[in-house]
Swiss-Prot record:
Residues annotated as binding Zn(2+) 2: C185, C188, C211, C214
Span of zinc fingers (CR-type): 156-237
UniProt xrefs under InterPro entries: DnaJ, DnaJ_C, DnaJ_domain, DnaJ_domain_CS, HSP40/DnaJ_pept-bd, HSP_DnaJ_Cys-rich_dom, HSP_DnaJ_Cys-rich_dom_sf, J_dom_sf
Protein name: Chaperone protein DnaJ
Positions contributing to Zn(2+) 1 binding: C169, C172, C225, C228
Boundaries of every J domain copy: 4-69
Job of this protein: Participates actively in the response to hyperosmotic and heat shock by preventing the aggregation of stress-denatured proteins and by disaggregating proteins, also in an autonomous, DnaK-independent fashion. Unfolded proteins bind initially to DnaJ; upon interaction with the DnaJ-bound protein, DnaK hydrolyzes its bound ATP, resulting in the formation of a stable complex. GrpE releases ADP from DnaK; ATP binding to DnaK triggers the release of the substrate protein, thus completing the reaction cycle.
Domain notes per entry: The J domain is necessary and sufficient to stimulate DnaK ATPase activity. Zinc center 1 plays an important role in the autonomous, DnaK-independent chaperone activity of DnaJ. Zinc center 2 is essential for interaction with DnaK and for DnaJ activity.
Molecular function in Gene Ontology: ATP binding; heat shock protein binding; unfolded protein binding; zinc ion binding
UniProt superkingdom: Bacteria
Entries under SMART domains matching the protein: DnaJ (SM00271)
């Protein structure tokens, strides 16, 4: 089973493009084959990182992946060799990765041999923290499980759920401040970031991180709201509508942007991740887009043929059992299976026919069965012997 692309890059579902790009650069440097010659494990990690970045750096692919998982992007993501480079990653990512190889990772170093490329493509450090200062702290993602019947999965369904999550505080309107007043953070002086400078034999390195005092916001609260203790969020309950497409499977999930926990002090809300769980069906067995129904038929009906009523996911339908039907025969009812996730009709229902053998019979039925047993036409060995004889053996039997 493929690893989640967000886990591969070590980012969350609410991460923006800059966070994803930064994580990709760091991992690309860490697992690059030039830094790990002959290391097959590092090579595999490098391919996984490239594949994940190709999807998550593309808005359309990321949207489909968030909604349907790996099934949503299909073969569009690289399967090992090409990765982000083959998928069209911009040159700034490539040059930045090489820059990191020369400078020791994610930190910036003065006098980088690739500084010109970095400036040309907007790869300068520090922007991420400043952007966080203007947008606040993101809320966390929320994951729930949604149980579905096979009937609901077959055609898709709309579900309305009540979800407990962090919501903006009504008293302070999510600001976390009792009066609404804020002041410039004394630690970062409003930049939302702090810098740590270290000197090595290779030069001076500057590591930039979000300010721990204000969380990257650049401002702090003067007087905290007593209802939410300055967080700007409280536990609440909201109602969400979920449009479940036909054809989902166990473990498939849908990401609902901005429906997760609200961010502290006005920060953007995280995502709601709905994981689908198929309820075991007592009548049908699922096989991909098809369903299987086991039907027991009496011996006379198997021999003579009959019409029976069988259940489907859409209601009962009439089914013809042809004369001479053999046990384990699969009869198809077209279009009564599971809808395809990406559209294009539904699968089929297969009816597996078997002989019904009663455990107890009446005296009269026993006598009838004894008479039937005497018939050579009902003896499987007689049929087998007859079919296995050669032409000359059959001719000899006729004239002897």
């Amino acid at each position: 089973m493929k690893k989640d692309y967000y886990e591969t890059l070590g980012v969350t579902r609410s991460s923006n493009k800059d966070d994803i790009k930064k994580a990709y650069r760091k991992l690309a440097v860490q697992y690059h084959p030039d830094k790990n010659p002959g290391n097959k494990e590092a090579e595999e990690h490098f391919k996984e990182v490239n594949e994940a970045y190709e999807v998550l750096s593309n808005d359309d692919k990321r949207r489909r992946y968030d909604q349907f998982g790996h099934a949503g992007v299909g073969s569009s993501a690289a399967s090992g060799g090409g990765g982000a480079y083959a998928g069209g990653a911009d040159f700034s990512d490539i040059f930045s990765a090489f820059n990191d190889m020369f400078t020791g990772g994610g930190a910036r170093r003065g006098g980088s041999p690739f500084g010109g490329f970095e400036d040309a493509f907007g790869g300068g450090g520090g922007g991420g923290a400043r952007r966080r200062a203007s947008s606040g702290i993101h809320g966390t993602d929320l994951k729930i499980r949604l149980k579905l019947t096979l009937e609901e999965i077959a055609k898709g369904v709309e579900k309305t759920l009540k979800v407990k999550r962090q919501v903006p505080c009504e008293v302070c309107n999510g600001t976390g401040s009792k009066t609404g007043a804020t002041e410039t953070c004394q630690t970062c002086h409003g930049s939302g970031e702090v810098r740590q400078v270290s000197k090595t034999m290779f030069g001076q390195f500057v590591n930039i991180a979000a300010c721990p005092t204000c969380g990257g916001e650049g401002r702090t609260i003067k007087e905290r709201c007593t209802a939410c203790y300055g967080e700007g969020i409280k536990l609440g309950e909201t109602t969400v509508k979920i449009n479940v497409p036909a054809g989902v499977e166990n473990g498939n999930y849908m990401t609902m942007r901005g429906q997760g926990n609200a961010g502290p002090r006005g920060g953007a809300a995280g995502d709601l991740i709905v994981v689908f769980e198929e309820i075991h069906h007592e009548t049908f067995t699922r096989n991909g887009h098809d369903v299987i129904y086991n039907l027991a038929v009496s011996y006379p009906d198997m021999v003579l043929g009959t019409k029976v009523e069988v259940p489907t996911l859409d209601g009962a339908v009439k089914l013809t059992i042809p004369a001479g039907t053999q046990p384990e025969t699969m009869l198809r009812i077209q279009g009564h299976g599971i809808g395809h996730l990406k559209g294009g009709g539904r699968g089929d229902q297969y009816v597996k026919v078997n002989v019904f053998v009663p455990k107890e019979v009446s005296h009269q039925d026993k006598e009838l069965l004894k008479d039937l047993r005497k018939s050579s036409n009902l003896c499987p060995n007689a049929h087998h012997d007859s079919e296995s004889k050669s032409f000359f053996e059959k001719a000899r039997d006729i004239f002897s």
